């Protein structure tokens, strides 16, 4: 579980953020918790930790397992710094690695400029996967970390958060992301047991 990120989510969204964890809790509990909080939400976003398939035993307890338990589509956030078409091989690997995990699209970050963005969007076209946006490099958006998490002690967080939100609104296809969330998601009463 990550208690620092949930505090940040709560501060930005104005709504409590929770941990979903199949290492410390059963899949059934994760489904119940998600369903309980989803009832009163317009949109539910589940942030993964580490790499998508990184768990305590191969992919057990991973973000991919959470996506499978909850039957959620995955949006990959890919660091595109100093890379272009080679990322196609990596993204294709994520798409094909586990057929039970639906990789619905990609958000690229650390994008260098217009030409770099063009090259990254070509990857999505060639792989027939949605590109939800390309986030540019901005020094103003760099957050200092403290104990592996965001530093809440600095003053002026509100202006940084507003800058982040403006950039995200400009560089992400919010409508396309929201369209994906409108799909009917059937949260199973009892997820399949881990093997």
Regions found by a protein language model. Give the residues of each.
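Short hydrophobic alpha-helical runs that function as membrane-insertion/retention elements
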Residues: 74-77, 132-134
């Amino acid at each position: 579980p990550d208690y620092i990120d949930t505090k940040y989510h709560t501060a930005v969204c104005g709504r409590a953020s929770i941990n979903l964890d199949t290492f410390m809790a059963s899949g059934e509990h994760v489904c119940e918790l998600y369903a309980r909080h989803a009832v009163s939400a317009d949109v539910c976003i589940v942030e993964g930790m580490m790499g998508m398939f990184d768990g305590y035993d191969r992919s057990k307890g991973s973000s991919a397992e959470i996506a499978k338990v909850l039957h959620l589509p995955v949006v990959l956030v890919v660091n595109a710094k100093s890379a272009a078409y080679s990322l196609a091989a990596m993204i294709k690997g994520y798409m094909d690695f586990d057929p039970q995990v639906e990789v619905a699209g990609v958000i690229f970050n650390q994008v260098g400029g217009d030409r770099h963005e063009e090259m990254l969007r070509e990857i999505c076209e060639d792989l027939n996967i949605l590109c939800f946006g390309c986030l540019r490099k901005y020094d103003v958006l760099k957050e200092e970390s403290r104990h592996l998490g965001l530093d809440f002690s600095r003053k002026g967080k509100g202006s940084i958060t507003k800058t982040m939100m403006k950039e995200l609104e400009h560089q992400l296809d919010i409508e396309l992301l929201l369209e994906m969330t409108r799909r009917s998601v059937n949260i199973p009463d009892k997820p399949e047991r881990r093997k």
